[in-house]
Amino acid sequence: MGTQGKVIRCKATVLWKPGAPLAIEEIEVAPPKAKEVRIKMVATGVCGTDIKHLDTQELSKFCPMIMGHEGVGIVESVGEGVSSVRTGDKVILLCIPQCGECKTCLNSKNNICTEIRLSKTHLASEGTSRITCKGKLVHQYIALGSFSEYTVLKEISVAKIDEGAPLEKVCIIGCGFATGYGAAINSAKVTPGSTCAVFGLGGVGLSVIIGCKAAGAARIIAVDINKDRFAKAKTVGATDCVDPRDFEKPIEEVLSDMIDGGVDFCFEVTGNTEAVGAALGSCHKDHGVCVTVGALASFTSTLSIRSHLFFSGRILKGSILGGWKTKEEIPKLVSDYMAKKFNIDPLITHTLTLSEANEAVQLMKSGQCIRCVLLL
């Protein structure tokens, strides 16, 4: 590409302060340095995690910032020493990097590379950024920042994918789908013929249902107070749909009545800390497994769970990004989609452009949208 080695001026959505609308700005994207990759972004999903953090003061010291992390694009150029991708490759952004060398990368039971530390700084280039706007250094959300026409990332945060992959579809595999599907396949290890319940029917919750179905679950109960989501849940594999508000008794008692003694596997995907106890209580007392999927409402929240729920054999565990070793396994998920092993198309309900990013945010907040994709 004729842009190699040059600063690229392009458009991006910039968050100047928490709670403010995203601003469409011209930014400058410098060439990649050693072990870095510059990417022409093509599509990005708008994730619930982006929405949650837009209005929180947690990001105030990192503004200006480019939000977004669920993205795909084409490699424009690479820095010295990059070997896993080259110019022209289709790539997917990795919400958790995989260096392949640290203690956790070498542990088969762990998917949290120590280089995830970069996400806390929101800087993709070891203490700095290759992106500026109006003379200011621009941070990149969790060291990615996909709401931009171009970005620069570390090689360990990028993976090559199938050259035939439809980027406007597979972008959501990078976070939302991988998180939910993997929670069922890897974290819970759902078994054939089992019973499952899924609390929360957003994009991640529906992806859990797809995972439960793929694992051979016999009964999958979708739980949400938004009945508009029930048809979509049935489309992707739910056998039953329940609104807790339709009953006078607690949801755990409702599910225990539906499935004698409780379900084998329950997934809490609402992010509501108060729902964790109900999800655990919905599991069979002797062998039920409850998985909290993704981030709860706040990292400082305290769980209040009745101790008797642990008296027998129930298990409560967490799951982050579905337990996938990202650089190795996220591309395989893209290939599995191409091979029609599962269908993510029903999860994408809206497709907009970068200039419509604020409309996408409002759609997600309103509950009218499962997953919105921005074309860049």
From Swiss-Prot:
NAD(+) binds at G200, L201, G202, G203, V204, G205, D224, R229, V293, G294, A295, R371. It comes from the Eukaryota. Its cofactor is Zn(2+). GO terms for molecular function: alcohol dehydrogenase (NAD+) activity; all-trans-retinol dehydrogenase (NAD+) activity; zinc ion binding. Its EC number is 1.1.1.1. Zn(2+) 2 binds at C99, C102, C105, C113. One of its GO terms (biological process) is retinol metabolic process. Keywords: Cytoplasm, Metal-binding, NAD, Oxidoreductase, Zinc. Pfam families: ADH_N (PF08240), ADH_zinc_N (PF00107). It catalyses: a primary alcohol + NAD(+) = an aldehyde + NADH + H(+); a secondary alcohol + NAD(+) = a ketone + NADH + H(+). Zn(2+) 1 binds at C47, H69, C175. The keyword NAD applies. It is found in: Cytoplasm. Gene3D superfamilies: Medium-chain alcohol dehydrogenases, catalytic domain (3.90.180.10), NAD(P)-binding Rossmann-like Domain (3.40.50.720). Dimer. Belongs to the zinc-containing alcohol dehydrogenase family. Class-V subfamily. This is Alcohol dehydrogenase 6.
